[in-house]
């Protein structure tokens, strides 16, 4: 699965059915199923349809009048798809753990991290297989400094705003359904984002305009 050949984010973008905005494209979904191990893609889609995924946005200036939900989606579109956000958006990607009493799962696609057991397991396995002479950076990150080799793919991309280099986390070393699900949502297309947040209303976008509530969100994650 070479980054030079496959642009995953473009494949994710085709998941939304162009003829019916209430359905996913079965052909693209079937193709993606075989591109990830451990039924990872199926688990990611199931997660997107589970109503257990949340995007919390620290909202200091949001106008509470009118359609708040649509406005929040516009904020996400500006941040992840148009790059037109005037300020750094503070947000958290959270998944409700289905195990009773377990803390919420924190997902960070910008730095390719997830607090779930699956990600930690494969991350540590990658570390154990690392030769003592190898740098961790070389083991887990693919660095591209040749502009001719640059890719438009945004899946597992780190620091996408750099103009001199591209970095991709080697997701075949460590990936989980949570990272894949949020990547499908936020590293694909506006249509896919709206499919899960607006059309099917399975992923919830929630504004927090109180700093105390924002801090409590983080406390609940680490407890």
From Swiss-Prot:
GO cellular component, one term: nucleus
Compartments where found: Nucleus
Protein's UniProt keywords contain Nucleus: yes
Keyword Cell membrane part of the UniProt annotation: no
Protein's GO biological process: DNA recombination; DNA repair
Superkingdom field: Eukaryota
Main location: nucleus
UniProt keyword annotations, A-Z: DNA damage, DNA recombination, DNA repair, Nucleus
Subunit annotation: Component of the SHU complex composed of at least CSM2, PSY3, SHU1 and SHU2.
Function text: Plays a role in a RAD51/RAD54-dependent homologous recombination repair (HRR) pathway to repair MMS-induced lesions during S-phase. Required for error-free repair of spontaneous and induced DNA lesions to protect the genome from mutation.
Similarity field: Belongs to the SHU2 family.
Name of the protein in question: Suppressor of hydroxyurea sensitivity protein 2
Organism: Saccharomyces cerevisiae (strain Lalvin QA23) (Baker's yeast)
Gene: SHU2
């Amino acid at each position: 699965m070479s980054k030079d050949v496959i642009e995953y984010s473009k494949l994710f973008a085709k998941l939304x059915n162009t003829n019916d905005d209430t359905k996913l494209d079965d052909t693209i979904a079937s193709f993606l199923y075989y591109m990830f191990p451990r039924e990872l893609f199926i688990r990611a889609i199931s997660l997107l349809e589970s109503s257990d995924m949340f995007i919390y946005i620290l909202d200091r200036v949001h106008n509470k009048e009118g359609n708040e939900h649509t406005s929040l989606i516009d904020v996400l579109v500006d941040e992840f798809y148009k790059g037109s956000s005037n300020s750094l958006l503070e947000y958290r990607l959270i998944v409700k753990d289905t195990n009773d009493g377990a803390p919420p799962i924190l997902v960070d696609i910008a730095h390719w991290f997830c607090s779930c057991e699956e990600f930690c397991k494969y991350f540590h396995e990658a570390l154990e297989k690392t030769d003592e002479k190898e740098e961790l950076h070389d083991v887990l990150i693919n660095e591209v400094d040749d502009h001719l080799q640059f890719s438009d793919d945004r899946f597992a991309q780190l620091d996408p705003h750099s103009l001199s280099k591209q970095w991709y986390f080697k997701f075949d070393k460590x990936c989980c359904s949570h990272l894949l699900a949020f990547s499908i949502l936020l590293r694909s297309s506006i249509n896919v984002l709206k499919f899960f947040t607006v059309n099917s209303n399975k992923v919830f976008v929630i504004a927090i305009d109180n700093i105390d509530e924002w801090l409590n969100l983080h406390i609940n994650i680490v407890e």
